[in-house]
Amino acid sequence: MRISKASLVRPGANEVYGIFALALSLFVFAYSARFGQVSILAYYGLWLPLVLVDYRKVLGNYASYLWIFAFTIFACITIFWSAAPSLSLRTGIQYLSHVVCALIAMRTIDIRTLTRGMIAGAAIVLLYSLLFGTYHYDPLDGTYSFVGAFASKNQLGFYASLGIYFAFAAVFVLGEKGLWMGAAGGAGLLAAYCLLTSQSATSVLTTAAVIGLCLGMRAITALRPASRKLLFIAASVFGGVAAVAMIYAGGVDLILGAFGKDSTLTGRTYLWQQGIEAAKVSPLVGVGYQAYWVQGFSEAERLWEEFYIGSRAGFHFHNTFIEAVVETGLIGLILLTMVLVTAFFGQLKRLLSEDRDPESMVLFGVGALLFVRAFVEIDILTPYHVGSFLLYFTAGKLTIPRRRRAATLLWPAGLDPAPYGRTFGPMIPRPGDSR
């Protein structure tokens, strides 16, 4: 049987290849530190050769991506004033090529293939961690936690969060049945187990918040587009007031206490303070992309020692915005935040304006997860990370024009509601039709 090369780059027609490529990409993102450069080359080999099949279709119009590449280009430019220019050059090029791969995936992968690939990839990553993982002692809070095959429980927790979210999206948004419904259920249970064993409060709280938000948006989008915005605004105002009331009532300390944390977030607030002080050294353009946490630099060495980081690597300020302003200054912070905010609110706008759009529903949840985690992690700031891959995938989808469909009923009279991602074909008789 001959398979057309064009089917490799046609969304929906390349499902098998797309699932394989996404699953292997996630494995590389998770464990490239273990398997080295060979795994990175395999990642490039999955996406870059697709350009040779049909470069116009795969690359699209890069003029529409200028706002997406703005931070990436600026990160590369920081080599001219970087405290570690060779490191900034290497990591800047890596980040740029990583963004290109994410945009190629965006052009060639549809939302159902993305969801299935993420489920498969998360399951493989978590199974590997269960088979070859270890426990880690945290000297700051005096506890042991399962970190899997990662260096941090928060990374294990992030992949578990993705497994839970995409399993939820597969069943409740895309309406998967049969084999993939079972796969989503199994992957979701595996991810939930890993999330609990990791004891990552960040991942547990953000996962619960995003799932709750998506359920709320699922209810809002059951209305016609004209009514959604008013209900969303009302719900947002109510949620904001409730959040403020909870903070003043001590609800935050109560929640943190349930996870064995205090108001310092296990030293995060001290790290944030140190990051803000470091940003004052070069507030406009920063010290250079990836040029702060460098062995031999006094401030980095001091913080590694204070937080018992014996490897003297893989550490950060646990806040995307602070990390960005330290490395790339206010200019870089604005450019990166522009991509993150546009990805989140752009998908939200589509969700509130269009009829039953499963792609926007799934990507809105992805944007929400990355946006919330940005305040406590740096998932989108480094190359070969699943967070940055998903960010640019989500942002890139906004550059593809949408075909406006005629307004339809939510579901025909006398029939059960369809899953969120399913639509009714034209053969369904209209009410009163005699055929």
From Swiss-Prot:
Localization annotation: Cell membrane
Transmembrane spans: 11-31, 35-55, 65-85, 117-137, 156-176, 178-198, 203-223, 230-250, 325-345, 361-381
Keywords: Cell membrane, Exopolysaccharide synthesis, Membrane, Plasmid, Transmembrane, Transmembrane helix
Keyword hit for Transmembrane helix: yes
Membrane topology: Multi-pass membrane protein
InterPro entries: O-antigen_ligase-rel_domated, WaaL-like
Keyword field contains Disulfide bond: no
GO cellular component, one term: plasma membrane
Pathway connected to this protein: Glycan metabolism; exopolysaccharide biosynthesis
Entries under Pfam families matching the protein: Wzy_C
One GO term of the biological process aspect: polysaccharide biosynthetic process
Function: Involved in the production of exopolysaccharide.
Protein name: Exopolysaccharide production protein ExoQ
Protein species of origin: Rhizobium meliloti (strain 1021)
